[in-house]
Design a protein with these regions (language model features):
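Conserved N-terminal subdomain of the carbohydrate kinase-like
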Residues: 2-89
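Glycine/small-residue-rich loop that forms an oxyanion/phosphate-binding "nest" at active or ligand-binding sites
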Residues: 69-118
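Conserved phosphate/ATP/ADP-binding segment of small-molecule kinases
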Residues: 101-182
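Short, well-structured alpha-helical segments that form the helix of a local strand-helix-strand
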Residues: 155-156, 160, 216-232, 252-253
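Short pre-catalytic strand/loop immediately N-terminal to key active-site residues, enriched for Gly-Thr
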Residues: 185-196
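Short, small-residue alpha-helix embedded
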Residues: 194-226
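Charged C-terminal helix
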Residues: 230-273
Length: 273
């Protein structure tokens, strides 16, 4: 069951190196702490190799990339690969600009990732080399729905096979897939879209899950997605009149902090296709 994955995170307290964006860095750190991991943030090229060396996982997020941080991403990624660390790419906004798209594609080519996690438009951009990403949000025309679910599953499996890694496509319906099996996940609340950075937070947390569960990476990635979605549901249940998205953000982090094996196993909504 997926609950074992979060239990392993809490037992092992994996240290995760995050090269993440400046908009959400504090929340990424807090979510990593809440799930049982330990965060460290560094994107300075002269620093990242040593930082990655003392960690167990690497989370690369291109949300606020610049020339210096891009250099740091490649240096950290190469070192993580040398050490066999869990690695994740979050190609935020790929398809919205040439720099983002080219950087994400080159990272895929030069670094071995265990998971690529993004919205459907970002992942399609990596597949096609260009896309229709609207800022950092998925294009509505690309969204995975009940009507096109079979097509989405087939795309996820094909992309995972081509990329040689797990893909986690998040949205109203989440798909977490390798070349053979796809977790279709239906946890979450639409109101989570009113909080900036829930995807970035998930990427940090997912890296901790991968690091603590090296023998079951597909299940670990799915467990992280279910944890975030279920936390959104639990957090929303505590909202009161007058509460807004700032309160909701904190409720989600609190729900992750209090998540345990039993709660996750009971509340996770998924099927394997």
């Amino acid at each position: 069951m997926l609950g074992n994955c979060i239990e392993n995170v809490r037992k092992n307290v994996p240290l995760v190196h995050n090269i993440t964006n400046y908009v959400t860095v504090n929340d990424v750190a807090n979510v990593l702490l809440a799930c049982g991991g330990s965060p460290i943030m560094s994107d300075e090229p002269e620093d990242v190799k040593e930082i990655t060396s003392i960690c167990g996982g690497l989370n690369i997020n291109i949300g606020t990339l610049n020339k210096r941080s891009i250099e740091g991403m490649f240096a950290a990624g190469a070192r993580a690969n040398e050490l066999g660390h869990a690695t994740l790419l979050d190609p935020v906004g790929a398809g919205a600009s040439t720099l983002r798209t080219n950087t994400a594609v080159e990272l895929m080519e030069k670094i071995r990732f265990d998971v690529i996690r993004g919205n459907i438009s970002e992942v399609k951009t990596l597949e096609q080399g260009s896309g229709t990403t609207k800022g950092v949000d998925a294009d509505v025309a690309d969204a995975v729905t009940e009507e096109n679910l079979e097509e989405g599953i087939a795309f996820a499996k094909a992309f995972a096979k081509k990329a040689g890694c797990i893909v986690a496509i998040t949205g109203a319906i989440d798909l977490v897939s390798d070349a053979d099996r796809c977790y279709v996940i239906r946890n979450g609340r639409p109101e989570m879209g009113k909080i900036t950075g829930t995807g970035c937070q998930l990427s940090g947390m997912m890296t901790a899950f991968l690091t603590a569960n090296p023998e079951q990476k597909l299940e670990a990635a799915a467990a992280a997605v279910c944890t975030m979605g279920l936390a959104g549901e639990i957090g929303w249940s505590y909202m009161q009149k007058g509460d807004g998205n700032a309160t909701y953000r904190n409720r989600i982090i609190d729900a992750i902090y209090n998540m345990d094996k039993e709660t996750l196993d009971k509340g996770a909504k998924y099927e394997i296709r």
